[in-house]
From Swiss-Prot:
The keyword Signal applies. Residues 1-21 form the signal peptide. The RxLR-dEER motif acts to carry the protein into the host cell cytoplasm through binding to cell surface phosphatidylinositol-3-phosphate. Secreted effector that completely suppresses the host cell death induced by cell death-inducing proteins. Residues 310-323 have a biased composition (Polar residues). This is Secreted RxLR effector protein 118. One of its GO terms (cellular component) is extracellular region. Belongs to the RxLR effector family. It comes from the Eukaryota. Its main location: secreted. A motif (RxLR-dEER) lies at residues 48-65.
Amino acid sequence: MRGAYYVTIALLVVASSQISAEFGHQLQAYDHDVTAADDAVAETLAKRSLRGSRDVSNDVAIEERTKYSNVIEDGIEMLLRAAEALKEMPRAAVAVKDMPRAEEAVEKMAPIAEQDLLKNVIGADEASKRRRAPHGISTQRTLALPFKEWNTELKQMRGGSVLKKYRSKIKSVHQAFVDLCDKDLNPTVTETALLWGMFDWDVKSYSASAHKHNLIRLAKRYVHKDVVQIQSDDLAWNRWNEVSIPLRIGALNILLNLHYQRWVRMYNIFEQYQSALIGTPVSLELSLGGTTGTSSATALDKHLEVPMNKASTSKGKSSVFTRSSKRAFDSKTGTTSPSSKHSKMQRSSSPLTESTTSGDDPVFTKRSRHGVAVTSLSSISN
């Protein structure tokens, strides 16, 4: 209470000084309840002001700071917080009421865990029954060769053919492969033989990276064939030479990606059904060539359930085909007879010529209508 007493005294003194100032009088200073004499020097009370308040022109700046002002402010804040806490108490009570008990939570968790476990088991069983798709080569890759890659001479475009070991079965394999592919792919006999040859490589060469590199080279050769076709038309070739080099490179890359995506799609399909397409000749003949009234794709689908015989090997190199038998099997009588189909195929004249290979990369392309052309893509810069 001493602080309040001092505050009251100070207010009275200030009020008295204001009144005396209005009447032109000055109050006498008191010190310890002692009144100064009439002839004594009058002294005023020392002014106490808050820090930084001397610049204020009103009388509030003369008030003395007390510690109770901070206490009052803290009390007001505590009251506000208490009021907010009282408002939140009903909400907290409702939340506690709705909170699930431990027993109820345990009862609900058991059925959920059983359902998830049953769902996972069913999903795993269905996945095991489905045919596992191979990884294959991604179709999301976009090729963009620079000018340096295009400004190089490619090898001579040569006529391609089916290798001798594939000739006896290439027609049935090609027909089954066409049925498996989409209509927009429409693979040719030579393309089927080329894919067959890629999967008939040595084990060391059988890798996705090597196949991917080979598919890029095949797509690049197809672009070369497109350029050869443009050269055969004088008007189209003149227009091509009028285009700037960057635009030519962009057009070549577009064609390259079109051919590459087509090759990748055919490659992935052939890899997925590899065991059925290039299985042993006898089982392949019975499932594809021996069926009547049904499509090759249906026969191939049934053939997927038939286990394959072991492939023959020679000189350390694996081959998915055994030597073709010269005797045909009669399913009705259960006897074998000499096959005339094989000799007819050998005597028949094939429109495909013998292939020439470079290393492990055989060239299987159809002979151009305009003949063999030796062209360099470096001419695009001329």
